[in-house]
C-alpha cells in the first residue's frame, strides 16, 4: 500500500489539533495538554504544512479554523478511534492490559512470599485479577519465553539474565538444608557433612527444579552418587516422603517455618553450602506495562521488608 502521508503528520500533532478545535484557542489548549503555547502553535503550524493546505486564518491574535480544519477533524476522530481499538486488540492478543496478570511460581514460594506479594498487589491494583501457575524453574521459564506467563518467581543465578530479553527483580537469598525424618537421631548442633550420609536413601525433586540442580552439585562435591528412592514433581510431596521416613532430602530454608516440627533441618557443612537467589523475572519488552511495574514495585518492597 502506497503511503502518501507526510511525515509531519503525527498522532501527537493530531491530538493537539483535536484539543485546539475543542478549546478554541492556543492558551486553553496548552493548559489542557500541559504544553507551552509555543509548542501548541508549532504543532498546529507543522501539521498545516504536512496536510498541504491552509487550516487556519489569523484574526488579530486569534487563530480561527477554516472549513478544511473541520473536515480534517471529522476524519481525525475516526482515525484516533480506530487506532485506539487497534491498540487495544493488539494488547489483548499479547495478553497485556486485560485486567489479568499471569504469574508463575515455584511451589515452595506459595507458603509466604507469593501470598504477601499478592496481598500487596491487591492493595495497589484491586481491580487486577491474578492467575497463578506452579511448576519447576525450567517449566516456568519456558512458559515465560512462550508468552504463556507474564512474570515468574524462580531461582536465578547471578548474571544469568544479563544481556537477555528479561528484567530481573531480586527478592531474597535462601540457604539449602539437609532434611531428615523426625525419627532420626541426629545432632542438630553439628553441620551436616554429606559424606556421613552416603549409606542413606534420598528423595529428590525431578530435573528442571532449582533445588534438584543444587542437589546434584552438592553430591558431586561430596564425591558420591546418592541412592535416590524416588523423584517427585513438587516440594510438598518430597517433604511428605521425608516425614514418612522414606529418605533424606535437600530443602530450601524457606520451608523451615512450616515444617520444622515435622522434619529435621540441618545446616550443611561449608563445602556443600549453597544459596538460592529468588527473583521476579519478566520480559524486557513489557517493562512499561503498568501491571508488571506494580508487581516489580511490590517485589522490591517485599525484598526490603525481609532483608532489613
Swiss-Prot record:
Which InterPro entries would you find in this protein's record? LysR_subst-bd, MdcR_PBP2, Tscrpt_reg_HTH_LysR, WH-like_DNA-bd_sf, WH_DNA-bd_sf
HTH lysR-type domain location, by residue?
9-66
Q: Which residues bind DNA?
A: 26-45
Q: Name one GO cellular component term.
A: protein-DNA complex
- DNA-binding listed as a keyword: yes
Q: Which Pfam families would you find in this protein's record?
A: HTH_1, LysR_substrate
Protein keywords: DNA-binding, Transcription, Transcription regulation
Q: Which residues form a coiled coil?
A: none
Can you provide one Gene Ontology molecular function annotated for this UniProt record? DNA binding
Claim: Transcription regulation is one of the keywords in the record: yes
**Reported function:** Transcriptional regulator of the mau genes for malonate utilization.
Which family is this protein grouped under?
Answer: Belongs to the LysR transcriptional regulatory family.
Q: What is this protein called?
A: Malonate utilization transcriptional regulator
Q: Which gene encodes it?
A: mauR
Amino acid at each position: 500500500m502506497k503511503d502518501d502521508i507526510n511525515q509531519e503528520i503525527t498522532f501527537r500533532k493530531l491530538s493537539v489539533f483535536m484539543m485546539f478545535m475543542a478549546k478554541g484557542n492556543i492558551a486553553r489548549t496548552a493548559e489542557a495538554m500541559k504544553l507551552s503555547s509555543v509548542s501548541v502553535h508549532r504543532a498546529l503550524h507543522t501539521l498545516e504544512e504536512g496536510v498541504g493546505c491552509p487550516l487556519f486564518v489569523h484574526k488579530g491574535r486569534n487563530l480561527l479554523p477554516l472549513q478544511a480544519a473541520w473536515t480534517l477533524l471529522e476524519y481525525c476522530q475516526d482515525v484516533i478511534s480506530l487506532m485506539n481499538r487497534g491498540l487495544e486488540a493488539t494488547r489483548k492478543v499479547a495478553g497485556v492490559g486485560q485486567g489479568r496478570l499471569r504469574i508463575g511460581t515455584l511451589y515452595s514460594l506459595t507458603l509466604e512470599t507469593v501470598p504477601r506479594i499478592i496481598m500487596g498487589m491487591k492493595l495497589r491494583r484491586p481491580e487486577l485479577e491474578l492467575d497463578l501457575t506452579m511448576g519447576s524453574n525450567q517449566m516456568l521459564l519456558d512458559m515465560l519465553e512462550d508468552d504463556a506467563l507474564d512474570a515468574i518467581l524462580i531461582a536465578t543465578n547471578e548474571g544469568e539474565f544479563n544481556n537477555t530479553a528479561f528484567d530481573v527483580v531480586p527478592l531474597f537469598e535462601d540457604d539449602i538444608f539437609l532434611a531428615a525424618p523426625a525419627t532420626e537421631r541426629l545432632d542438630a548442633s553439628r553441620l551436616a557433612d554429606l559424606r556421613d550420609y552416603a549409606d542413606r536413601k534420598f528423595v529428590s525433586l525431578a530435573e528442571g527444579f532449582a533445588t534438584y540442580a543444587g542437589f546434584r552439585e552438592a553430591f558431586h562435591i561430596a564425591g558420591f552418587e546418592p541412592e535416590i528412592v524416588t523423584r517427585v514433581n513438587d516440594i510438598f510431596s518430597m517433604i511428605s516422603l521425608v516425614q514418612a521416613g522414606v529418605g533424606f532430602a535437600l530443602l530450601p530454608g524457606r520451608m523451615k517455618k512450616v515444617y520444622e516440627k515435622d522434619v529435621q533441618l540441618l545446616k550443611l557443612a561449608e563445602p556443600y553450602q549453597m544459596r538460592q537467589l529468588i527473583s521476579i523475572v519478566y520480559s524486557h519488552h513489557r517493562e512499561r506495562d503498568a501491571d508488571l511495574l506494580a508487581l516489580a514495585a511490590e517485589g522490591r518492597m517485599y525484598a526490603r521488608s525481609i532483608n532489613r
